[in-house]
């Protein structure tokens, strides 16, 4: 379970978010909706431990009954998928994925884990492929595989579908939701598009917390 408790974010001269509270159970996907600038991505930055220095924050982040906002980023065990795939083009597809694997996985098990993931995503045989030769949809799949191979205990989706064309977007979206639900981890996504919201899942309007919301609409 992922719990955001009484979180407020502010700049020196203004408040951005006030008293954010929500909980995501294992296997559930909660969607945060609101216009650009209302604080969605800033909240994600705080959750992963990458909040810009100009912001101050109060509140707590809990994951599986452990408070994690006081931990370094690497120890929080939260994965994130961005709009851009952010692959390392100097490495092959397989090398990109190997970088994500936990150090506890050794020897041939590392290569096998990557090949299994590629096969599951329809990219069998792409281990040695140059990421620059991949289509947008393929790059997006590799980015998700990289996030999941790190074995996160929770996952954040920061509008990962927004730059895909309509045909790719629907298929990739359904594949993402299937993958994360199979892992039974809590997921939070931000989006502007109601079509990105899974059926029978919760949607939270940023208006209830954002100080800028009404100015941006």
UniProtKB/Swiss-Prot annotation:
InterPro entries according to UniProt: AAA+_ATPase, ABC_SmlMolc_Importer, ABC_transporter-like_ATP-bd, ABC_transporter-like_CS, P-loop_NTPase
UniProt similarity note: Belongs to the ABC transporter superfamily.
Residue sites binding ATP per the record: 34-41
This protein's encoding gene: ynjD
Physiological role: Probably part of a binding-protein-dependent transport system YnjCD. Probably responsible for energy coupling to the transport system.
Gene Ontology biological-process annotations: transmembrane transport
PANTHER family: SPERMIDINE/PUTRESCINE IMPORT ATP-BINDING PROTEIN POTA, SPERMIDINE_PUTRESCINE IMPORT ATP-BINDING PROTEIN POTA
Top-rank taxon, per record: Bacteria
Alphabetized UniProt keyword annotations: ATP-binding, Nucleotide-binding, Transport
One CC-aspect GO term: ATP-binding cassette (ABC) transporter complex, substrate-binding subunit-containing
Gene3D superfamilies, per database record: P-loop containing nucleotide triphosphate hydrolases (3.40.50.300)
Protein name listed in UniProt: Uncharacterized ABC transporter ATP-binding protein YnjD
Start and end residues of each ABC transporter domain: 2-216
Pfam assignment, any one: ABC_tran
Species per Swiss-Prot/TrEMBL record: Escherichia coli (strain K12)
Sample GO molecular function, one term: ATP binding
